[in-house]
From Swiss-Prot:
GO terms for molecular function: 2-succinyl-6-hydroxy-2,4-cyclohexadiene-1-carboxylate synthase activity. The keyword Lyase applies. It comes from Yersinia pestis. This is 2-succinyl-6-hydroxy-2,4-cyclohexadiene-1-carboxylate synthase. Pfam families: Abhydrolase_6 (PF12697). Keywords: Lyase, Menaquinone biosynthesis. It comes from the Bacteria. Monomer. Catalyzes a proton abstraction reaction that results in 2,5-elimination of pyruvate from 2-succinyl-5-enolpyruvyl-6-hydroxy-3-cyclohexene-1-carboxylate (SEPHCHC) and the formation of 2-succinyl-6-hydroxy-2,4-cyclohexadiene-1-carboxylate (SHCHC).
Length: 272
């Protein structure tokens, strides 16, 4: 059994859930991140217990690898089982969002209560687009393996999806992500390329648990995607592609509102 590194956060002592087992919030980070990225939001959602997961090749799971989406979904299921988590809400950002959608649609998730996706791509609709993306991701992976990481990251954060970042914010992210292990990032990037990802929209539309799509109001690419495919969209003010980092308070409020609407959580916890 392969289990991913993770950190548990107990509910607030005053939470009605503190003494009673209930659904967990399980958080999946993006490429180059770690479970710690979710800590500010998870703490603001403190009426729920949280599990902050390090995906393969990242954080404390840096030595773990994955053979595609099905394998990562299996590792996630085994991690939840090992931690005694039977009921959970799954939240994921960017790469973590894509993994979360795949897991919800195709994985073993008998206790899944709902799905929250931030800026996750649904996939590419035809083989030509998938092949082009696979080639692009292989080029990035080669750079992550061979070049100094700060140099690669400086170019990585120049991509159009990060256009909302100013130079200082880019510099901060390069410094923050420079402690990654380039070859491990490369392996994960190739294993989870959009070129390997199935087109998830049809399965998502058949999903039998509630789901929502969160997006920064400056993240034009994923705003357009959500609107094009009529996803249940909620936007975050003053935020780009990484909305939970830019505006954790607003993000946590959206999470709690969704959970309240979907599971009849008492309104008092929304104002905390």
């Amino acid at each position: 059994m392969t289990t991913l590194a993770c950190r548990k956060l107990a509910p607030h002592p005053e939470s009605p859930r503190h003494q009673h087992a209930g659904p967990w919030l399980v958080w999946l980070h993006g490429l180059l991140g770690s479970g710690q990225d979710w800590l500010p939001v998870a703490q603001l959602c403190g009426d729920y217990p949280s599990l902050l997961i390090d995906l393969p090749g990242h954080g404390q799971s840096v030595s773990l690898s994955a053979d595609g989406f099905a394998d990562i979904s299996r590792q996630l299921s085994q991690t939840l089982q090992a931690n005694g988590i039977r009921e959970y809400w799954l939240a994921g950002y960017s790469l973590g969002g894509r993994i979360a959608i795949y897991h919800a649609c195709y994985g073993r998730h008998h206790g899944l209560q709902g799905l929250l996706v931030e800026g996750g791509n649904l996939g590419l609709e035809n083989a030509e687009l998938r092949q082009a993306r696979l080639q692009q991701d292989r080029q990035w992976a080669q750079r992550f393996r061979q070049e100094p990481l700060p140099q690669v990251l400086d170019d990585w954060y120049q991509q159009a999806v990060f256009a909302d970042l100013d130079p200082q914010q880019r510099e901060q992210l390069v410094l923050l992500r420079a402690d990654n292990h380039g070859p491990a990032v490369a392996e994960m990037l190739e294993a989870t390329s959009l070129g390997h990802q199935p087109w998830l929209l049809p399965a998502l539309q058949r999903l039998n648990v509630p789901y929502t799509y969160l997006c920064g109001d400056r993240d034009h690419k994923f705003l357009q995607l959500a609107q094009q495919y009529r996803l249940p969209l909620h936007t975050l003010a003053r935020a780009g592609h990484n909305a939970h980092r830019a505006n954790p308070g607003a993000f946590a409020a959206q999470v709690l509102a969704f959970l309240s609407q979907s599971s009849c959580l008492p309104p008092s916890s929304l104002s905390r």
